[in-house]
Amino acid sequence: HGTSPEDVAGRSYLEWLTSLEAGYAIISSLCRRVVIGGFSTGAGLALHLAARVQDAAGVFAVSAPMRLNDLGARFAPALDAWNRLMDKLSRSAAKKEFVENHPENPHINYFRNPIAGVRELERLMDALDPLLPDINIPTLVIQSDSDPVVNPKGSRQIFKKVGARDKEYILFNIDRHGILLGEGSERVHKRIGTFVERLGRAR
């Protein structure tokens, strides 16, 4: 968000992590207790950071994309390989760099997604998977049971693998991916708020 599909197409998940780490360093220097959290790709990034930073108060992950429902996402690795081959053969006209998107929140989401960006998301989640047992801080995993983008089986997998003893999995009966906005979102906000307040009181 905040740049362009073309910009996302040229980025790696390692750059996303570097940006997150810089933000965490700044906030940690200003606050005694920091709770890491994120939605969708941001949830994956938050969990990745939580596995490596043990001084955070806790982490929450909303709709983390461990498993994607979107059929187009399943073809991202093959399309990414095809695009790289076409680059080597100087056949840029044969490349398929973007797929059309019908966002739930058009005011913040792109109308086309870069194949390379989807592939980087998959690389992020692949890198996260073996790190999940290293998360030892309080963890809250939240998911919609009818998410059209993220398969709830993936969030359950995350919850089971997280190493923290203090962990909770909450499944909301909402039929969309973007559960932080719209009808029912106040229930999600309340649950996250309760989690953060509890961690703020802990010493």
Please describe what each predicted stretch is.
Residues 60-71:
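Active-site nucleophile loop of the alpha/beta-hydrolase fold
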Residues 135, 141-143, 147:
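Short beta-strand/loop motif that positions the catalytic acidic residue
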